[in-house]
Amino acid sequence: MPQKEYHNQATWESGVASMMQNSHSGVNQLGGVFVNGRPLPDSTRQKIVELAHSGARPCDISRILQVSNGCVSKILGRYYETGSIRPRAIGGSKPRVATPEVVAKIAQYKRECPSIFAWEIRDRLLSEGICTNDNIPSVSSINRVLRNLASEKQQMGADGMYDKLRMLNGQTGTWGTRPGWYPGTSVPGQPNQDGCQQQDGAGENTNSISSNGEDSEETQMRLQLKRKLQRNRTSFTQEQIEALEKEFERTHYPDVFARERLAAKIDLPEARIQVWFSNRRAKWRREEKLRNQRRQANNSSSHIPISSSFSTSVYQAIPQPTTPVSFTSGSMLGRPDSALTNTYSALPPMPSFTMANNLPMQPSQTSSYSCMLPTSPPVNGRSYETYTPPHMQAHMNSQSMTTSGTTSTGLISPGVSVPVQVPGSEPDMSQYWSRLQ
């Protein structure tokens, strides 16, 4: 063990000395010495392979030889792949392995078998002797060659399509000019470039297309090419629309079985039916939103404010009294005159629900509707129409009276806009009065 440590120390010292002599040298994280841009010596490479054959793991080899783990893995991977421990080209970039001959062979293999993999192409290049282990391209390099071939083929196809369109439109110069794309019109002041005869009819000039077979064939080819570039919108017949609307009334979200059944029935692709239902749901949401807006507008226009007075056709108007509270006796419901019917006028709504005891009511504060309450024995009343039972007279006499007395009905304070009917029996009224107090 001391001898090994001494060996490691000597190696580190020699590495430091070498680093002092060469400015581009360094020490890795394990204490091993390396030179930037230069591969490991062949002796170290051979030791890495020997330790790997003896069963040592790459991490153990890295610690024993003080070589980085990435370097050990790269050397072992290249050894298992090619059987060689020699480094790649030293100095500069490696020579180009994808030569034109190799690229031509790769393209040939791809044409013969379009689904071939890059590693299969690599094996064929080795088996047929086109490349050796030293100049064989890697799998990533072969994939890059295949991508370049595919892009070149696509570009050639696009150029050929554009050339065909130029030929069909009678163009020899620029692409997409006005005379070629718009044969039905001509620029004023210029001769007709299509060689068509101008005909005068109905006050307009048109360029007639020659009626020979070649022109009609070119027109058909032009239409076919344009159809390939863009799909036309699907047009539905009346029967198809009726079937789709009927299914939409049943459900807005048909499942795949319903769509397939509908597709077989009306002879449409299932994808088109799915798109139709999506558009129809969007239309239904817009219509539902408009219906809700109209419904809200109608409700707001027919609403009656709370502060408005009631109609006189429902509630009979009573002449305006000169006193704060008007009392009339009579038989309004067919009762005898002995039955006392009290009519009262309510005050306009006030912000608070309070009982005003001693405030006089002004005649201008009365409103225009009246109501009948059940009969009660004549007792002295107070202002603001509060009911006083007989056994409460002692308490009531201690307070000031503002109105002269006939019967007054039990009414809650002016803040309530709807009249409240108070029971006429004395025990109930006593309980009611105690609650109000």
From Swiss-Prot:
Q: Where is this region: PAI subdomain?
A: 26-82
* Segments for region (RED subdomain): 101-149
Task: Please verify whether the record's keywords include Nucleus.
Answer: yes
Keyword Nucleus listed: yes
Record field: compositional bias (Polar residues): 187-213
- Where is there biased composition of kind Low complexity? 402-427
Record-linked SUPFAM superfamilies: Homeodomain-like
Q: What is its main location?
A: nucleus
Where does it live in the cell?
A: Nucleus
Q: Which GO terms describe its molecular function?
A: DNA-binding transcription factor activity, RNA polymerase II-specific; RNA polymerase II cis-regulatory region sequence-specific DNA binding
Q: Where is this region: Disordered?
A: 183-220, 396-437
**Which residues does UniProt assign to DNA binding?**
23-149, 229-288
> Where is it found, in Gene Ontology cellular component terms?
nucleus
Q: Which GO terms describe its biological process?
A: brain development; forebrain development; regulation of transcription by RNA polymerase II; retina development in camera-type eye; sensory organ development; type B pancreatic cell differentiation
Highest taxon in the source lineage: Eukaryota
Keyword set, alphabetical order: Developmental protein, DNA-binding, Homeobox, Nucleus, Paired box, Transcription, Transcription regulation
Q: Belongs to which family?
A: Belongs to the paired homeobox family.
User: PANTHER family given for it?
Assistant: PAIRED BOX 10-RELATED, PAIRED BOX PROTEIN PAX-6-RELATED-RELATED
The role this protein plays is: May be a transcription factor with important functions in eye and nasal development.
Instruction: Report what the protein is called.
Output: Paired box protein Pax-6
Species assigned in the record = Oryzias latipes
